[in-house]
Regions:
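A generic structural signal for ordered alpha-helices
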Residues: 17, 21, 39-47, 138, ...
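A structural signal for short, well-ordered beta-strand segments and their strand-loop junctions
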Residues: 3-5, 51-53, 200
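A glycine- and Lys/Arg-enriched "phosphate-lid" helix/loop adjacent to the NTP-binding pocket
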Residues: 1-41
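Phosphate-end processing signature that detects enzymes handling 5′-triphosphorylated RNA
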Residues: 59-60, 66-238
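Short, exposed beta-strand "edge-strand" segments with a Pro/Gly-rich flavor and a Y/T-containing core
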Residues: 20-27, 54, 144-152
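Histidine (H) residue identity feature
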Residues: 5, 46-48, 207
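Generic detection of intrinsically disordered/low-complexity segments and helix-coil linkers/edges
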Residues: 11, 37, 52, 104-105, ...
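NTP-dependent small-molecule kinase module
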Residues: 22-24, 31-86
Length: 238
């Protein structure tokens, strides 16, 4: 599943915001913008959140929504376009105090798979409340991968753990999901690093400009560097 949030006209298209055509709408522009921020915050932490802003025209907004949905559902297969960055170890207090950020604990296990495929299962959640996923990935390019994902019951998850690839260790990480400037960052903090972390962002267009908050210090982009992929970090060294 995924969440596609269309930003209110009260943020970026104020001239089109009106209460005249909707008797249920009573908020001022400022109130509507504040409620929109709260709604985005409520969905922050979802594994697939997309925020559709008012940068251009309403028609462009609808085209972007359709592109995001097509990217998620896939034509003919679902795929992800993802950019990945090595960053300095983030300010955890800033992240955890930020209302636009949600902390998630993840345990990721790689399963035995066919050549050219990557199969993993995840436990994802916080405070004892977890959901489970199986994901199959096939590489298309450095930035683009076919991704097929399905929800699992706890029983299915535990059964699939029996198929774990014994050449790889489990990956445990804390993920901070952060919305900023209508972008959705996933910042992964690993227990074996004290000086760096990984920031990822998914998009529907490979040429989308990315704007980082000033609190996030980018060391370099590592999208095409396989050594920073979770599958490589999980590899047990001889």
């Amino acid at each position: 599943d995924a969440v596609f949030h269309l930003v209110t006209a009260a943020k970026g298209a104020e001239e089109f915001y009106t209460t005249a055509n909707n008797s249920a709408r009573t908020e001022t522009v400022e109130e509507a913008a504040a409620l929109d921020d709260k709604l985005i915050s409520a969905w922050t932490g979802h594994p697939h959140l997309r925020v559709i802003d008012n940068t251009l025209t309403f028609e462009d907004k609808m085209k972007k929504l359709i592109a995001e949905i097509a990217s998620f559902l896939g034509e003919p297969e679902p795929y992800e376009i993802e950019r990945k960055y090595l960053i300095e170890y983030p300010d955890i207090r800033w992240l955890e105090s930020n209302p636009a950020c949600q902390r998630i604990e993840i345990i990721q296990t790689y399963l035995n798979s066919a050549a050219g495929e990557e199969v993993r299962v995840r436990q994802r959640g916080i405070d004892g409340n977890y959901i489970y996923y199986q994901t199959i990935k096939r590489k298309v390019s450095d930035m683009k991968r076919v991704e097929i994902e399905r929800r699992l019951s706890q029983a299915e998850y535990l059964k699939l753990l029996m198929l774990a690839d014994t050449t790889k260790r489990q990956i445990r990480k804390t993920r901070y999901c952060l919305t900023y400037e209508n972008q959705y960052f996933e910042i992964d903090v690993y227990p074996f690093w004290s000086d760096k972390a990984i920031a990822e962002i998914e998009m529907s267009d490979e040429h989308t400009e990315i704007v980082f908050p000033k609190q996030i210090k980018v060391i370099k982009e590592v999208t095409d560097d396989d050594s920073f992929r979770n599958a490589s970090l999980a590899q047990i060294k001889e």
